């Protein structure tokens, strides 16, 4: 069987420059090629008429151009939105699958995309960790997710993605080179699809060395930290990575991020019944957040099959919220999206190994 040629879209932009210059071509040829791949979204070297025939033939002999595809989707309509929350199964060129979600809200439509196939952090409330870590995604595979979801949105609803969050499967800061390269592509104002970096967020479990590095880079993306508990032993019990990145060190890192970037941090706190919803938990969160330039995003838990956690009762979550507000913290409450379609990360990939229903019409 003939060996598949490497996918040229798997290169970061610096890697693409090195590949093209190694063929004796000037670096600007790589910039032209990159624009055709990620702005024009060409699928054949023959279409790239801005470069000469000899180079097109050379590239065709050593590289392929392959694109991810939408394999399936599930939708959940809400009364206050014309556009449903839609969860997609995205198939990569090697048949690896990840998840991406379109989330409508007032005045915005957010694409939640994956940065890894699986995850190595094994957060106990997350379905992705149950699938294990398989590989990092390339920057091209991340941009493909955005383009595919944007195409779906344009075709069915005549709208476009307004925000992007790297909050799907995987830990973005453990694949930082390709995540940042994808962000550079998605925010290139010379490309057909372009979004301000201020409309792009990276969500992390709190990988301190990479947070420190991100603070020193010129990118203007937003940072969200999955906190989920401000009590160290409790956080370790639901997020094993917290043992390596303890709360005092994390708080110091976030304060430095505030200072160097001038940007606030979002602390994401998912309420879990009888796990992190007590008055003591609220007090610990207030103490952790009080001196930081931050806002807190409280979210409901989407129940996951074969995982023990449960959503918090409404009355208890309201008391928790009131404790934070009374302490002067800025808090937003994110209502649960996609409960009926298993929108929590990792569930659709797990189910895809068995059977998926046809896309609703």
Swiss-Prot record:
[4Fe-4S] cluster binds at residues 119, 123, 126. Its main location: cytoplasm. The active site is at residues 99, 345. One of its GO terms (molecular function) is tRNA (adenine(37)-C2)-methyltransferase activity. Its EC number is 2.1.1.192. GO terms for cellular component: cytoplasm. Keywords: 4Fe-4S, Cytoplasm, Disulfide bond, Iron, Iron-sulfur, Metal-binding, Methyltransferase, rRNA processing, S-adenosyl-L-methionine, Transferase, tRNA processing. Pfam families: Radical_SAM, RlmN_N. It catalyses: adenosine(2503) in 23S rRNA + 2 reduced [2Fe-2S]-[ferredoxin] + 2 S-adenosyl-L-methionine = 2-methyladenosine(2503) in 23S rRNA + 5'-deoxyadenosine + L-methionine + 2 oxidized [2Fe-2S]-[ferredoxin] + S-adenosyl-L-homocysteine; adenosine(37) in tRNA + 2 reduced [2Fe-2S]-[ferredoxin] + 2 S-adenosyl-L-methionine = 2-methyladenosine(37) in tRNA + 5'-deoxyadenosine + L-methionine + 2 oxidized [2Fe-2S]-[ferredoxin] + S-adenosyl-L-homocysteine. CDD domains: Radical_SAM (cd01335). NCBIfam families: rRNA_mod_RlmN. Specifically methylates position 2 of adenine 2503 in 23S rRNA and position 2 of adenine 37 in tRNAs. Reaction proceeds by a ping-pong mechanism involving intermediate methylation of a conserved cysteine residue. This is Probable dual-specificity RNA methyltransferase RlmN. It comes from Chlorobium limicola (strain DSM 245 / NBRC 103803 / 6330). The lineage of its organism: Bacteria, Pseudomonadati, Chlorobiota, Chlorobiia, Chlorobiales.
């Amino acid at each position: 069987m003939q060996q598949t040629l490497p996918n040229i879209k798997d290169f970061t932009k610096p890697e693409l420059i090195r590949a093209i210059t190694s063929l004796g071509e000037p670096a600007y040829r790589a910039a032209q090629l990159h624009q055709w791949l990620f702005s024009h979204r060409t699928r054949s070297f023959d279409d790239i008429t801005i470069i000469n025939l000899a180079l097109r033939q050379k590239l065709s002999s050593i590289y392929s151009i392959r694109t991810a595809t939408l394999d399936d989707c599930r939708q959940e309509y809400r009364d206050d939105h014309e556009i449903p929350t839609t969860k997609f199964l995205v198939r990569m060129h090697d048949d690896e699958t990840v998840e991406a979600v379109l989330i409508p809200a007032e005045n915005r439509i957010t694409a939640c995309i994956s940065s890894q196939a699986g995850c190595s952090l094994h957060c106990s409330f997350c379905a992705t960790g149950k699938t294990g870590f398989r590989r990092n995604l390339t920057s091209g595979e991340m941009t493909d997710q955005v383009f595919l979801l944007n195409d779906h949105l344009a075709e069915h609803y005549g709208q476009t993605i307004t925000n992007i969050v790297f909050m799907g499967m995987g830990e973005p800061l453990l694949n930082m080179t390709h995540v940042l390269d994808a962000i550079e592509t998605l925010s290139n104002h010379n490309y057909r699809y372009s979004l301000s970096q201020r409309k792009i967020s990276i969500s992390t479990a709190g990988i301190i060395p990479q947070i420190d590095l991100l603070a020193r880079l010129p990118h203007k993306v937003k940072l969200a930290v999955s906190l989920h508990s401000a009590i160290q032993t409790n956080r370790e019990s639901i997020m094993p990575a917290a043992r390596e990145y303890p709360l005092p060190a994390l708080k110091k890192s976030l304060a430095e991020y505030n200072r160097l970037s001038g940007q606030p941090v979002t602390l994401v706190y998912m309420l879990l019944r009888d796990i992190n919803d007590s008055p003591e938990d609220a007090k610990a969160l207030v103490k952790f957040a009080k001196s930081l330039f931050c806002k807190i995003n409280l979210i409901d838990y989407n129940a996951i099959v074969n995982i023990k956690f449960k959503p918090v009762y409404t009355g208890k979550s309201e008391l928790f919220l009131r404790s934070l507000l009374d302490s002067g913290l800025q808090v937003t409450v994110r209502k649960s999206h996609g409960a009926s379609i298993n929108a929590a990360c990792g569930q659709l990939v797990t189910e895809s190994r068995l059977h998926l229903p046809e896309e609703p019409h």
